[in-house]
């Protein structure tokens, strides 16, 4: 989705991304349930993330959208007492398989968090660090990979003359794009974005949104956002969640113009949430 042609929806005047044909499934979710101890946080979730498509997850705080995102790369394994049941497939790989190598899973399914999290090291090493975890390559190959990753993060032209500067010296927007470049560097298949622009100014937000659209040419993307305009601008599909349930999942254009469920309509028009 490299170009964004927009029309205005009847539901709040939101700009709409163009409708694309259905894509082959990259991630398939069937009857997924998730528990924090005895608390049933997600209930019978069923959806599909299309290959090289952007799927937005919207809903009020606490509805389960960020929880769902973290199941896609098993981040919940870091916390005792949390468990998922059901089926969650990445192509032919069962993400919920207890024997799955989580390091390899997280190379295939990368994640960009709400707050930029650059490592306390140089810009170059921020990118090279992850590559070294999975590959042994020459210095010249590493230089090439670092450049490609920074270009993929739309950051190369801004940092090419200061690769030895600390990643922490960059602005907030640049730090977030560095984190995106770091994720791209290990060549994932899926990239998860959890409120990636919530801490950024409007100019930096626009750059990240444009970057997400460019990345969708090569990656399958899932993004959690509270910003309805952002969901409408960048996504092909939108999932509306409420109280741990998936209420509606459809083309973004339909969700924002003629949702099937009244709760979806009420949320996107600001009646609650």
UniProtKB/Swiss-Prot annotation:
One of its GO terms (biological process) is phosphate ion transmembrane transport. Its main location: membrane. It catalyses: phosphate(out) + ATP + H2O = ADP + 2 phosphate(in) + H(+). It is a peripheral membrane protein. GO terms for molecular function: ATP binding; ATP hydrolysis activity; ATPase-coupled phosphate ion transmembrane transporter activity. InterPro entries: AAA+_ATPase (IPR003593), ABC_transporter-like_ATP-bd (IPR003439), ABC_transporter-like_CS (IPR017871), P-loop_NTPase (IPR027417), PstB-like (IPR005670). GO terms for cellular component: plasma membrane. Residues 27-268 form the ABC transporter domain. Keywords: ATP-binding, Cell inner membrane, Cell membrane, Membrane, Nucleotide-binding, Phosphate transport, Translocase, Transport. It is found in: Cell inner membrane. Its EC number is 7.3.2.1. ATP binds at residues 59-66. It is an enzyme of class 7 (translocase). It comes from the Bacteria. PROSITE patterns: ABC_TRANSPORTER_1, ABC_TRANSPORTER_2, PSTB. The complex is composed of two ATP-binding proteins (PstB), two transmembrane proteins (PstC and PstA) and a solute-binding protein (PstS). Part of the ABC transporter complex PstSACB involved in phosphate import. Responsible for energy coupling to the transport system. This is Phosphate import ATP-binding protein PstB. The gene is pstB.
């Amino acid at each position: 989705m490299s170009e964004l042609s927009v029309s205005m929806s009847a539901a709040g005047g939101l700009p709409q991304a163009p409708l694309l044909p259905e894509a082959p499934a990259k991630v398939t979710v069937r009857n997924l349930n998730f528990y924090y101890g005895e608390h049933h946080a997600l209930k019978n979730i069923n959806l599909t993330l299309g290959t090289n498509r952007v799927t937005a997850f919207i809903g009020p705080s606490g509805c389960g959208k960020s929880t769902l995102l973290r199941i896609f790369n098993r981040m919940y394994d870091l916390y005792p007492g949390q468990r998922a049941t059901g089926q969650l497939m990445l192509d032919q790989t069962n993400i919920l398989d207890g024997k799955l190598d989580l390091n390899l899973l997280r190379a295939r399914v990368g994640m960009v968090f709400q707050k930029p999290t650059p490592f306390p090291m140089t810009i170059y090493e921020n990118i090279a660090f992850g590559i070294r975890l999975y590959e042994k390559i020459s210095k010249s190959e590493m230089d090439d990979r670092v450049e490609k990753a920074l270009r993929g993060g739309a950051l190369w032209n801004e940092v090419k003359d200061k690769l030895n500067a600390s990643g922490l010296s960059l602005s907030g927007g640049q730090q977030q794009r560095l984190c995106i470049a770091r994720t791209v560097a290990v060549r994932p298949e899926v990239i998860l974005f959890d409120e990636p622009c919530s801490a950024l100014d409007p100019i930096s937000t626009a750059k990240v949104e444009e970057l997400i659209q460019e990345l969708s040419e090569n990656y399958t993307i899932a993004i959690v956002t509270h910003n309805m305009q952002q969901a409408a601008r960048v996504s092909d599909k939108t999932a509306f969640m409420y109280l741990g349930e998936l209420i509606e999942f459809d083309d973004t254009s339909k969700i924002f113009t003629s949702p099937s469920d009244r709760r979806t309509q009420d949320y996107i028009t600001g009646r609650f949430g």
